[in-house]
């Protein structure tokens, strides 16, 4: 019984604390408002401020009573409480004026301050930055919102510094007025906190201004910036010289460091970033990162307890509407802040985003969570979850080791779906969002999360957990999620759920704990609330008062504020010494070389601490012996997979250890003590001998080139970049189906995790450059629309994969067609057939669109003017048949299906055309073309004696309104060739450009248009085609080039000397016997390896030789042109692979089919070359690539190291960025000095395609170009008069040896009436002149070879034609009769008043001039008599002249008969007969004599000021070069033209 009584007493005493806590009720005060959504509170006080509609109110009793602040008269935009003086000072900014109010006594009094902004605005958005020590120093920043005349909103940013409002000083950039283009205007005090190492006690200010100029014509931007520093509180500023020529994007001021980010490319806001670090604000150094950084989450940068910088890195998504978090990784610097490395536990083969939280009050403690990129949707979809795991970890030793979050909760073990005793498989998973604003405490914290293995994260299953040991172990406290906060250093915990139950009801109570989460009480609120904010009134979490804000659930919501006061708990008792215990940080282990412990209240103590967190002493005991955790790798070293520090070649090259060494090697310690570490006895570190033989010396450009090597066990078979300027992302696929993704040009590569599913094919969307599709072997398709940062997984239809490519809509990113096999248990089964499946939602759902379809096109999205925007065309191959048909539909074959052709060979689309190959009789083909999807027209090929049957043709592309086509004329395997044809604008009428153009058995043709330049094409012809066709000789290839889109061709002009300065063996003047020949398209391993680049204008590489024919590949050398093919230079002996970078500013060559350890590069457009050794052992380089736009400075090499076992396949990323001193300056207006100038290409300073064009080229090789779209800024100096080179031969005409277009014998010209069918509104057409203008030409006036002759009526329009050109007899008759009547009346009047009245005609010869015998009674009589006298005078003179002429003629006639009377000869009629007896089709032969066109006004539109003799002469010379030895042959009308032509002919000779 005594024992029972004792136990009872003990139980009573244990119950007392709980009963006391249950009996306590916090003081809760409610405040309602209709206009305020937030309430501002002063630290550790009952004073609250809120803004009503027209007034500002204050409460000094936690919201029980409110009164209006009379000093504040205007509407307030915002309140700001001074973060360093939160107990007393606050600012209230006025919305409608540049004005704010200040209180220094917790709102009891306010004083106004007016900002001296002169510009008027409708709204002002201002904020303030205060100094942590100097109270009177303020920085004011205002955004001005005004409405301009155009109605557009304009934001101007202005910054002022002030000494407590006594005076204001505006801060301005030096580059001009702050306007709407200013994207950044920011100033901050260097000293960011009271314990900051920077700035001392002064008021130094750092300011950044950044201006962004938008180039509307190209869609690009130009950025400029200015970073300035003031050491006198804002009175004077000076620019930081180190950043003078750089674009500073942002900066961040931390406790120990200032971080400045500079944009690598001022013309690309998405370009990579350099990170500059300083600890004294005077000297900045570039930090080393694993790869180039593009997007940094500046607001989340912080320092850990030893001063290391934690740098979150993200990327921007292309889809602005997506709510998916941005991709990210977290880098942590060394203790010097100069070398960054990623967190070591993050999966290196998975893409996702990372959250890292660092509670600053817990030294050495980090929380991290990794979340794979998977898009979620509430809609039902056929997405399977990508099996990549969530991971959540904690570290208590500064990130050296990490562990899972262990759940220790025996009472609730049944609530978890896994065994929590095995934390490696079952642990707490969370996102750690709430830890960023965690209130300080001695290891007490709460988070929301779920318990599992990380394979799934269901937000609906989230619960709330608590930890008392800084996150090492956790316990469940609530089965829901909500808002929580702590007070009194963790001894008071408040929690309110977002929903009170599973039905989603609004919470009507909150929960609280007074024993660090062990037990919980609850409080019923007067009014339910949608909670959105729960905070302690003291920022460091040491107070006992809280503010809860939210909205009501009424139809007309009102804002609710609850003020909650726990200060009376435990009868206001404060803790004494016996109420505390020691709590060891990190379980008592050494952190930063010391052991740390806090004194915290015991869990069941009945008291409050009532002290600020900073007043709690953190006991620090240095550790005696240093261990490996106290060290980090020296700058030149990195940790390997085992954790050992090993030398890094790139870091050694960046450091100066070898520059300082006098020998061939240098001794370096691989470990260095972490800066600020407290351990007493250092470890003994053995130095490592680093060879310096291959390390580039200081001043060498090779020192600045950075190479990164990656090793693979299997060969990379496929690789392709995403064609965007956002970054350098690419996808690679190896020989066993593993996919890899890189976002930095191959520098860092991650394997794409498919949970064991092999990738069998990768397809890129040709219309949306950020999209790609990876086909899995198990029926999944992995889709990305953001360059591989995130993927969705779609389940393909239940059909066999046939390996057929997807077909995409050109206008809808999520719409494409997939082809699968039905009834294909065996691919050889006769029932196996293809089915086209359509998706419009990016793969969420597929519908069966068309059975037996093997190729479809979204035709309505391809044409410029489609007959129907929704039109789809499909090629259908029926089961048990080899026949293929072409069908179309405008509703995806639901109800509409139309057969276009019953039998086709195939079809394709190019440049706004669809071309169908249709079988014809006698095993021939016919081509039909459409440019609207409705009307198909047969393509008319020219008659030619060397064209037999139309057996095969290749579409080579379509540009500028013409289709280029290769029509095979010889199909014998290994000896294929044919004619190169070009169409008219609608693709239906073709003319021959060149004969015997080489092709291979696969249909590929040696044809390449030079990218970026108009009308330049290179082909290889079979020079001995006749003998090859007769099987008498092997092919002999020669290379030809055209500069006017195929109208004229010539051989390539060879260089005079080779790369070694020696003359070539052949030096004939005739290009037919000695020219440059290049291997072409038919021999390429990768068809993407073109001669030219669209961004390196005028530059082309080629492998070939100088001679009379093309030699085998291995016997050739490498040649370069920089003027579009006019002149060439041999740059290297032997075949090389090439690549362009920086728009041609960097050229790179690597030997082909030979092992090497070096590349050759040029930064002066190929004038000089340097070698760079990129690896230690020689490798066979399979390919060299860069971004499709050739604008990057990074190149990626794929190599194979022979006989090296595992990892013999390598990639090398070579970065040239650092060899350039700066970025080239470009001024679009041309008003300022820039590093570019306009110049013509080569010596072709005359006209080409009817205009003179100049191109931009950089002038300084020390600068790099970047993302300037140079090709967009080429300019046409002027349009030119038309010449022969602006025309090509029309259909059924061919170019003769004299340069004229002649009609093919036996044929007639194109039927001009065909145009009447295409344009029904026409009433007339014209016959062909034999010439047609080249579509690219813009010439005006001059020669008019295509001039039309007499018009003909269109069939059926004869009446309209006659009406247009016939005379209107009725109208003309009326006019004629009217004129006759007028003449008759005048004549009668003159006769009656002037002749008859004065005696009639009998006196006619008696009247003399001046005779007064005529009757003149009035003015009318005088006028009539004057007319009579004038008529008499004229008649006498005419009569006299006639008589004299008659007499002279009679005399000449008699003399002529006397001299020639007996001679006979041809009469005029016989001469006329000879003219008219010419052959009937002689009209067409007029095309043979171009003089007939000269009379049509060849110079009719040339103005005197446009005539430049030197340019005209040069134009003629250029024409002759383009047309070999063909003279222009145009007889001129003027002496100047005759002299020009004479000069041309003499030069031709």
Swiss-Prot record:
Compartment(s) where it occurs, according to its Swiss-Prot or TrEMBL record: Golgi apparatus, trans-Golgi network membrane; Endosome membrane
Spans of repeat BNR: 57-68, 101-112, 159-170, 228-239, 393-404, 465-476, 511-522, 740-751, 837-848, 1040-1051, 1119-1130, 1160-1171
Signal peptide span: 1-21
Membrane association type: Single-pass type I membrane protein
Keyword Transmembrane helix among UniProt keywords: yes
Transmembrane segments: 1370-1390
MF annotations from Gene Ontology: nucleotide binding; signal sequence binding
Protein name from the UniProt record: VPS10 homolog 1
């Amino acid at each position: 019984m005594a024992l029972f009584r004792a136990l009872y007493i003990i139980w009573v005493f244990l119950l007392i604390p709980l009963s006391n806590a249950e009996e306590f009720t916090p003081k809760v005060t409610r405040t309602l408002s209709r206009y305020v959504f937030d309430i501002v509170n002063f630290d550790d006080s009952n004073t609250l401020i809120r803004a009503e509609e027209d007034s500002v109110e204050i409460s000094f009793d936690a919201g029980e009573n409110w009164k209006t602040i009379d000093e504040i008269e205007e509407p307030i935009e915002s309140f700001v409480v001074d973060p360093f003086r939160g107990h007393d000072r606050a600012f209230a900014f006025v919305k409608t004026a540049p004005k704010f109010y200040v209180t220094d006594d917790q709102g009891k009094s306010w004083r106004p301050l007016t900002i001296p902004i002169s510009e008027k605005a409708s709204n002002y958005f201002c904020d303030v930055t205060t100094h942590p020590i100097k109270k009177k120093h303020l920085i004011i920043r205002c955004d001005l919102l005004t409405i301009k005349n155009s109605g557009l909103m304009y934001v101007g940013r202005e910054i002022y510094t002030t000494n407590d409002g006594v005076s204001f000083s505006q801060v301005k950039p030096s580059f001009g007025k702050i306007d709407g283009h200013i994207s950044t205007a920011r100033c901050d005090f260097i000293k960011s906190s009271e314990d900051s190492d920077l700035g001392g006690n002064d008021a130094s200010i750092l300011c950044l201004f950044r201006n962004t100029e938008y180039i509307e014509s190209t869609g690009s931007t130009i950025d400029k910036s200015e970073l300035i520093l003031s050491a006198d509180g804002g009175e004077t500023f000076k620019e930081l010289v180190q950043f003078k020529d750089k674009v500073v994007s942002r900066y961040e001021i931390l406790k120990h460091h200032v971080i400045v980010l500079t944009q690598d490319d001022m013309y690309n806001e998405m370009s990579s970033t350099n990170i500059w670090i300083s600890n004294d604000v005077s000297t900045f150094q570039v930090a080393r990162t694993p790869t180039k950084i593009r997007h940094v989450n500046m607001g989340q940068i912080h320092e850990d307890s030893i001063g290391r910088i934690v740098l979150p890195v993200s990327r921007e998504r292309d889809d602005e509407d997506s709510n998916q978090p941005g991709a990210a990784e977290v880098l942590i610097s060394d203790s010097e802040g100069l070398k960054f490395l990623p967190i070591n536990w993050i999966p290196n083969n998975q893409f996702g985003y990372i959250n890292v939280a660092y509670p600053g009050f817990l030294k050495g403690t980090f929380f991290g969570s990794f979340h794979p990129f998977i898009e979620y949707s509430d809609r039902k979809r056929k997405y399977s979850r990508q099996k990549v795991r969530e991971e959540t970890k904690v570290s208590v030793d500064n990130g050296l080791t990490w562990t899972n979050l262990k759940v220790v909760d025996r009472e609730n073990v049944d609530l978890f779906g896994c065994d929590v005793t095995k934390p490696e498989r079952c642990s707490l998973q969370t996102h750690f969002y709430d830890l960023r604003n965690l209130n300080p405490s001695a290891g007490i914290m709460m988070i929301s999360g779920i318990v599992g293995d990380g394979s799934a994260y269901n937000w609906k299953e989230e619960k709330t957990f608590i930890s008392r040991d800084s996150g090492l172990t956790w316990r469940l406290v609530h089965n829901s999620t909500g808002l929580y906060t702590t007070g009194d250093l963790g001894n008071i915990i408040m929690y309110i759920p977002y929903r009170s139950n599973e039905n989603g009801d609004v919470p009507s109570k909150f929960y609280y704990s007074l024993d660090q989460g062990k037990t919980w009480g609850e409080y019923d609120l007067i009014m339910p609330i949608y909670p959105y904010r729960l905070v302690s009134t003291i920022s460091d979490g040491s107070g006992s008062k809280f503010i809860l804000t939210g909205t009501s659930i009424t139809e007309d919501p009102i804002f609710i504020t609850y003020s909650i006061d726990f200060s009376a708990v435990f009868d206001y008792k404060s803790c004494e010494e016996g109420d505390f215990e020691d709590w060891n940080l990190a379980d008592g282990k050494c952190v930063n070389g010391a052991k740390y412990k806090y004194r915290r209240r015991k869990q069941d103590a009945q008291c409050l601490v009532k002290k600020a967190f900073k007043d709690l002493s953190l006991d620090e005991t240095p550790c005696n012996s240093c261990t490996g955790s106290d060290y980090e790798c020296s700058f030149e070293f990195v940790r390997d997979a085992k954790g050992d520090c090993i030398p890094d070649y790139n870091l050694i090259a960046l450091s100066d250890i070898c520059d300082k060494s006098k020998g061939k090697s240098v001794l370096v310690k691989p470990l260095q003590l972490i800066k600020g570490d407290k351990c007493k006895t250092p470890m003994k570190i053995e130095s490592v001998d680093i060879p310096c033989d291959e390390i580039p010396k200081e001043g060498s450009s090779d020192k600045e080139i950075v190479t990164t090597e990656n090793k693979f066990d299997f060969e990379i078979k496929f690789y392709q970049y995403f064609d965007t300027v956002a970054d350098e992302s690419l996808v690679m696929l190896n020989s066993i189906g593993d996919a890899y993704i890189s976002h930095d040009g191959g520098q860092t590569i991650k394997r794409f995790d498919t949970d064991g599913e092999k990738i069998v094919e990768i397809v890129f969307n040709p219309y949306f450059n950020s999209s790609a599709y990876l086909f899995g072997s198990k029926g999944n398709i992995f889709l990305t629309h953001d360059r591989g940062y995130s993927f969705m997984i779609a389940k393909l239809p239940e059909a066999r994969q046939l390996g057929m490519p997807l077909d995409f809509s050109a206008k809808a990113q999520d719409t494409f067609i997939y082809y699968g096999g039905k009834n294909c248990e065996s691919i050889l089964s006769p029932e196996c057939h293809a089915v086209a499946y359509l998706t419009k939602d990016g793969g969420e759902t597929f519908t069966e669109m068309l059975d037996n379809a093997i190729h479809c096109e979204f035709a309505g999205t391809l044409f410029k003017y489609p007959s129907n925007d929704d039109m789809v065309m499909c090629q259908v191959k029926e089961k048990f048949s080899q026949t293929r048909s072409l069908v179309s539909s405008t509703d995806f074959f639901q109800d509409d299906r139309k057969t276009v052709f019953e039998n086709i060979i195939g079809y394709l689309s190019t440049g706004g055309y669809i071309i169908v190959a249709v079988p014809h009789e006698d095993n021939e083909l016919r081509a039909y073309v459409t440019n609207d999807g409705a009307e198909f027209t047969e393509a008319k090929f020219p008659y030619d004696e060397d064209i037999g049957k139309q057996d095969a043709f290749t579409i080579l592309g379509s540009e500028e309104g013409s289709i280029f086509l290769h029509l095979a004329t010889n199909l014998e395997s290994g000896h294929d060739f044919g004619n190169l044809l070009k169409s008219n604008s609608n693709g239906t009428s073709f003319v021959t450009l060149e004969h015997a153009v080489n092709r291979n058995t696969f249909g590929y043709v040696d044809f390449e248009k030079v990218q970026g330049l108009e009308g330049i094409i290179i082909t290889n012809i079979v020079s001995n085609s006749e003998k090859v066709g007769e099987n008498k000789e092997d092919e002999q290839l020669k290379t030809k080039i055209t500069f006017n889109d195929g109208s004229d061709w010539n051989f390539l002009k060879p260089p005079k000397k080779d790369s070694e300065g020696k003359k070539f063996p052949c030096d004939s003047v005739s290009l037919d016997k000695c020219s440059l020949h290049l291997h072409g398209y038919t021999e390429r391993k990768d068809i993407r390896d073109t001669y030219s680049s669209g961004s390196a204008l005028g530059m082309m590489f080629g492998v070939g030789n100088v001679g009379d024919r093309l030699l085998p590949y291995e016997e050739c050398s490498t040649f370069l042109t920089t003027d579009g093919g006019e002149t060439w230079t041999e740059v290297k002996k032997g075949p090389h692979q090439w690549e362009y970078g920086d728009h041609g500013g960097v050229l790179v060559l690597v030997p082909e089919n030979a092992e090497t350890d070096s590349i050759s590069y040029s930064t002066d457009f190929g004038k000089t070359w340097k070698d760079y050794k990129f690896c230690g052992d020689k490798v066979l380089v399979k390919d060299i690539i860069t971004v499709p736009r050739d604008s990057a400075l990074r190149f990626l090499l794929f190599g194979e190291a022979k006989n090296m076992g595992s990892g013999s396949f390598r990639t090398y990323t070579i970065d040239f960025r650092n060899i350039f001193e700066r970025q080239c300056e470009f001024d679009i207006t041309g008003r300022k000095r820039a590093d570019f100038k306009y110049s013509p290409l080569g010596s072709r300073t005359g006209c080409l395609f009817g205009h003179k064009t100049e191109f931009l080229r950089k002038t300084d090789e020390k600068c790099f170009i970047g993302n300037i779209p140079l090709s967009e800024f080429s300019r046409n100096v002027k349009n030119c008069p038309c010449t022969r080179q602006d025309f090509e031969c029309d259909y059924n005409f061919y170019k003769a040896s004299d340069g004229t277009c002649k009609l093919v014998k036996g044929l007639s010209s194109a039927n001009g009436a065909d145009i009447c069918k295409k344009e029904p509104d026409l009433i007339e057409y014209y016959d062909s002149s034999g010439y047609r203008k080249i579509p690219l030409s813009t010439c005006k006036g001059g020669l008019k070879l295509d001039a039309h002759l007499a018009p003909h009526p269109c069939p059926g329009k004869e009446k309209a034609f006659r009406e247009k050109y016939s005379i209107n007899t009725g109208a003309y008759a009326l006019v004629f009769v009217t004129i006759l009547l007028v003449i008759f009346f005048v004549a009668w009047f003159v006769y009656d008043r002037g002749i008859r009245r004065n005696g009639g005609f009998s006196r006619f010869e008696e009247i003399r001039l001046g005779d007064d015998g005529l009757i003149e009674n009035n003015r009318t009589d005088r006028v009539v008599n004057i007319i009579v006298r004038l008529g008499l005078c004229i008649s006498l003179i005419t009569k006299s002249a006639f008589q004299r002429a008659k007499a002279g003629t009679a005399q000449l006639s008699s003399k002529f008969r006397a001299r020639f009377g007996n001679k006979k000869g041809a009469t005029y009629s016989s001469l006329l007969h000879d003219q008219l007896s010419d052959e009937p089709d002689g009209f067409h032969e007029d095309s043979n004599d171009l003089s007939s066109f000269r009379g049509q006004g060849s110079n009719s539109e040339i103005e005197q000021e446009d005539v430049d003799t030197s340019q005209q002469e040069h134009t003629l010379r250029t024409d002759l070069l383009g047309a070999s030895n063909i003279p222009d042959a145009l007889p001129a009308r003027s002496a100047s033209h005759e002299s020009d032509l004479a000069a041309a002919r003499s030069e031709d000779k």
